[in-house]
Amino acid sequence: MAPKGSQRVVNKVVAENRKARFNYEIIDTYEAGLVLKGTEVKSLREGKANIAESYASDEDGEIWLINSYLPEYLQANRFNHEPRRRRKLLLSGREIHRLRSAVNREGMTLVPLKIYFNDRGRAKMELALAKGKKLHDKRESEKERDWNRQKSRLLKDNG
């Protein structure tokens, strides 16, 4: 327990997949818990994680996080974890069924957006149900983003 006078960091983002919003059209987001080992939690608390190349997959009625990188905790000697191991995601049965049906039927993908600690200190992941963008859609969103930047500059200068 933290002392009474200390302030707790609420929703501290540890890792973020910034390219996901550019490469995918986000349909819906879910909050999922992570099944982690002790050294993985300590490594996350140090802020060292990478989910840029990771994805989630449905296997045997469960959702798994694959190819996420949590480096080894340096102070743990031989009881360390494997950095790129598969990690189980904790979702309700209804959410798992909804995600499985969307992925199988509509050809969507499960993309992790960010890993963070909630107000109770638990490691959570924001998981997105997404559809991949085509190349012309990516170009269009990039043009729109550049135009919005130019607009804000013009309004600021002439404001």
From Swiss-Prot:
The keyword RNA-binding applies. It comes from the Bacteria. GO terms for cellular component: cytosol. Disulfide bonds: none annotated. It is found in: Cytoplasm. CDD domains: SmpB (cd09294). It holds the Pfam family SmpB. Its main location: cytoplasm. Belongs to the SmpB family. Required for rescue of stalled ribosomes mediated by trans-translation. Binds to transfer-messenger RNA (tmRNA), required for stable association of tmRNA with ribosomes. tmRNA and SmpB together mimic tRNA shape, replacing the anticodon stem-loop with SmpB. tmRNA is encoded by the ssrA gene; the 2 termini fold to resemble tRNA(Ala) and it encodes a 'tag peptide', a short internal open reading frame. During trans-translation Ala-aminoacylated tmRNA acts like a tRNA, entering the A-site of stalled ribosomes, displacing the stalled mRNA. PANTHER family: SSRA-BINDING PROTEIN, TMRNA-BINDING COMPONENT OF TRANS-TRANSLATION TAGGING COMPLEX. NCBIfam families: PRK05422.1, smpB. This is SsrA-binding protein.
